[in-house]
């Protein structure tokens, strides 16, 4: 099976969809971004511009290789960011710098900036330093292709409830997702995958128990 057909897009946010291009299949690590063509295919699948909007990609193999490398580095930074948020910590500064590097590569750009809590009243109320998302203007480049993904990651940092950032409850699945359900009780990456398999396994165990 073509590994591109294994792309899934039900994480609830673009950044986590990219993160889910690397996972375990059983005990084997599986990376779905093996070539520049894989990245272009993934971008097209999520409706992001690729070769058509950035001719320098289709006309320059080196630029396509840069795109692959940058996508993989961004994916690793997203992993470190969500792990930090789940641990109730600010993302490492170098991951914020990496996001900002991509966020500023577009005609309409964005940047994560530090908001320092200085007033005694705010400090007494338990308010802590945080990151805020600001708009800036900058020039475009090949990195601009990845800006919507970096923007998605930045919005996870500034807007998402860390409690809602989860990994699938199935022990052999590493999919991340943002739980946007009303109940906040989503456990599975997808009911059609891990959810139904877990229910079937539970039913089989009950049927196998001696009466």
How should each PLM-predicted stretch be described?
Residues 133-211:
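Cys/His-clustered metal-coordination modules, chiefly Zn-binding fingers
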Residues 1-164:
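Short helix-coil boundary/hinge micro-motifs
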